[in-house]
């Protein structure tokens, strides 16, 4: 059996930076209680290891309000502005491990909304990154994930301006399709493609590998937006695409008759 491993397999820059930030805080502040607001990344194995080292995951804003000491680390996906404001008001020390590319979107959304733009976020409304982005809007914001939602989108006034941004891990081709639908409405619109270049390149590489192999294995956490999209992309190119999280999930019987296998791992 011939195996082809994606060259860019593994954590992206923003995820690796966030993981390193947590371990650095553990090492440098061993006497302090370390918290992360939400799972620092979508990787169950990494989260378990951090918990063994004493890191506690805070899952709600109500829990966060009870924290009076220690260090809170903001997850790689970012948080709404109100969370940063809450930490400042309570005098809680925190470290912002938001991916720099996501942080850039926060700045864009805050600035454009203050200048009167209606913000359109193309992405998954259930994903913490999108929730965080929406939380930096100073005015109206709409999340669009499907073609139906794009067609249904309407401004209250035609004099409104629109600024479109995207979840960094959104499928690039879907983004283009949704932007085209919104653009047909002839609004005063600016479109900022904020999909991470690394995401786009990894999606293209995964698709190219999947096209030329007999079976494709996508490795990653089931909650990871990147992994879900890579599985979808690979499945479109290779019918025998498998989604696993650990080695124990791999059924070798499914691969006995194949000659070439592609492997793509991703986390976010």
Model-predicted regions and their roles:
Residues 68-69, 211-212, 257:
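Alpha-helix C-terminal capping/helix-to-coil transition sites in glycosyltransferase folds
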Residues 143-148, 168-175, 193-204, 222-223, ...:
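A general structural motif
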Residues 261-263:
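Phosphate-binding loop/pocket of nucleotide- and phosphate-handling active sites
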Residues 182-215, 220-221, 228-243:
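Active-site rim loops that border cofactor/substrate pockets in soluble metabolic enzymes
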Residues 60-61, 98, 123, 190-193, ...:
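A short glycine-rich beta-strand->turn/loop micro-motif centered on a GG-aromatic cluster
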Residues 267-268:
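Conserved small/polar residues in nucleotide/adenosyl-binding loops
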Residues 2-138, 142-157, 172, 177-183, ...:
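Active-site loop-to-helix "anion-binding N-cap" substructures in soluble metabolic enzymes
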């Amino acid at each position: 059996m011939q195996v082809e491993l994606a060259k860019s397999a593994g954590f992206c820059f923003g995820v690796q930076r966030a993981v390193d930030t947590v371990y650095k805080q553990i090492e440098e502040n061993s006497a302090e209680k370390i918290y992360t607001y939400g799972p620092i990344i979508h990787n169950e194995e990494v989260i378990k290891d951090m918990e063994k080292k004493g890191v506690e995951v805070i899952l709600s804003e109500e829990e966060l309000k009870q924290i009076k000491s220690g260090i809170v680390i903001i997850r790689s996906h970012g948080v709404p502005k109100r969370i940063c404001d809450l930490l400042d008001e309570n005098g809680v020390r925190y470290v912002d491990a938001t991916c720099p590319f996501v942080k850039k979107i926060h700045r864009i959304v805050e600035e454009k909304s203050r200048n009167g733009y209606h913000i359109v976020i193309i992405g998954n409304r259930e994903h913490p990154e999108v929730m965080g982005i929406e939380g930096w809007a100073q005015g109206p914001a709409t999340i669009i994930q499907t073609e139906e939602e794009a067609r249904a989108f309407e401004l209250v006034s035609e004099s409104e301006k629109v600024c479109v941004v995207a979840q960094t891990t959104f499928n690039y081709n879907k983004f283009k399709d949704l932007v085209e639908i919104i653009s047909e409405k002839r609004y005063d619109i600016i479109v900022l493609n904020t999909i991470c270049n690394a995401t786009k390149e990894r999606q293209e590489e995964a698709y190219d590998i999947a096209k030329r192999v007999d079976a494709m294995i996508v490795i990653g956490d089931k909650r990871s937006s990147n992994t879900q999209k890579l599985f979808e992309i690979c499945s479109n190119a290779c019918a025998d695409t498998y989604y696993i999280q650990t080695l124990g999930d791999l059924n070798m019987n499914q691969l006995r008759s194949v000659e070439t296998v592609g492997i793509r791992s991703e986390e976010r």
